């Protein structure tokens, strides 16, 4: 009996390994053939993701032209990325099909799904010749869609060039800060300060946050940069997609300027992945890889002024190269998000939240 038990255990292990490695053995041809049997790609994301319905229509047409498919993107606006990640985990654990065939999120969101073993394993760089290994932020699970360096944004009509900050530290420099004292906008989030502690350490960040609050004039969310453009606030301490904001507003004549806060720049890497239990898994895998093509990146640039620094010829790639700007390695923040939140980390975030509230 023991002999048979060992045999079936070994057989089960082989079957499990075969299933686990199935997607790694796929070829692009076999994926395209399988994808042609699926009629639509269900995508739930923010309302204006990838340019909203106009941008998604262009992506749909370009996708079908490249792969010879007749795919339709069934798009629905959904909750924020944290809520969508949590929903997928709940769906998978309960054995249900997931509500979106693909998931878009930054390091923190994808790390949550990775920790829960909720993502399909796909050998993207092995299957698709245009996908390089470094594009797989979580190897075999996620692929970079666009790069979002953080930074300061300010109104150049209100902040003289000789008084403009060159980094985060300048914001609280007594020689420069009188220019924006009492008028500085601060984002109401602790995440950017928590990530800054990976470079500066917790005590320096807490001291910095206190100094920011002392000269602040209000709070602005990352979607409210128009209030800097209008002059209501001359400057904002951090904006999560600073370069994209600058590239969106400057062609309209707005005096919005973005400045890196630290070097290398603290950066959000927005990646696509395929959650387990996807209804249309083959179209999903193709779409994740497709978003790194030049034609897909051109659509992102057209509608969102966003692109990947790892795709040759994109606005982001050229800007960083021409200005000799280095972005923070993904592994730095990924390591932070992959760790289970310990008591010290939670306490630090609570302290930051209290500081930002002025309490």
Please report, for each region that a protein language model flagged, where it lies by residue.
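C-terminal segment of classical bacterial N-terminal signal peptides
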Residues: 15-23
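Extracytoplasmic ligand-binding site segments that recognize negatively charged/polar headgroups
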Residues: 44-61, 73-89, 96-233, 246
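Immediate post-signal peptide segment of exported/extracytoplasmic ligand-binding proteins
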Residues: 24-43, 64-65, 69-70, 177-181
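Extracytoplasmic/periplasmic substrate-binding proteins
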Residues: 200-205, 215-277, 312-324
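Extracytoplasmic "Venus flytrap"
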Residues: 26-28, 38-56, 270
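Conserved C-terminal helix/tail region of periplasmic/extracytoplasmic solute-binding proteins
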Residues: 328-359
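Mature extracytoplasmic/periplasmic domains
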Residues: 266, 270-335
């Amino acid at each position: 009996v023991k002999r048979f038990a060992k045999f079936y255990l070994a057989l089960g292990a082989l079957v499990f390994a075969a299933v686990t490695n199935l997607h790694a053995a796929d070829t692009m041809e076999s994926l395209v053939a399988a994808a042609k049997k699926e009629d639509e790609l269900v995508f739930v994301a923010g309302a204006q993701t990838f340019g909203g319905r106009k941008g998604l229509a262009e992506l749909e047409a370009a996708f079908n032209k490249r792969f010879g498919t007749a795919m339709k993107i069934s798009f629905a606006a959904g909750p924020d990325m944290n809520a969508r990640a949590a929903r997928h985990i709940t769906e998978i654990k309960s054995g249900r099909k997931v509500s979106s065939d693909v998931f878009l999120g930054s390091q923190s969101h994808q790390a949550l799904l990775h920790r829960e073993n909720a993502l399909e394993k796909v050998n993207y760089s092995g299957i698709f010749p245009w996908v390089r290994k470094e594009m797989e932020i979580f190897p075999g699970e996620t692929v970079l869609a666009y790069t979002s360096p953080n930074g300061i944004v300010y109104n150049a009509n209100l902040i003289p060039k000789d008084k403009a900050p060159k980094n985060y530290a300048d914001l609280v420099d007594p020689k420069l800060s009188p220019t924006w004292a009492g008028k500085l906008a601060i984002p109401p989030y602790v995440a950017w300060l928590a990530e800054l502690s990976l470079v500066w350490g917790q005590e320096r960040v807490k001291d910095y946050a206190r100094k920011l609050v002392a000269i602040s004039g209000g709070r602005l969310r990352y979607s409210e940069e128009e209030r800097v453009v209008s002059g209501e606030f001359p400057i904002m301490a951090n904006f999560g997609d600073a370069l994209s904001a600058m590239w969106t507003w400057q062609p309209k004549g707005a005096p919005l300027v973005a400045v890196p806060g630290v070097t290398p720049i603290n950066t959000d890497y927005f990646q696509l992945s395929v959650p387990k239990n996807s209804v249309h898994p083959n179209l999903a895998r193709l779409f994740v890889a497709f978003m790194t093509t030049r034609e897909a990146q051109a659509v992102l640039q057209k509608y969102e002024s966003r692109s990947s620094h790892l795709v040759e010829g994109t606005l982001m790639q050229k800007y960083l190269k021409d200005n000799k700007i280095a972005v923070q390695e993904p592994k730095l923040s990924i390591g932070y998000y992959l760790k289970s939140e310990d008591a010290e980390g939670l306490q630090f975030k609570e302290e930051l939240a209290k500081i930002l509230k002025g309490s």
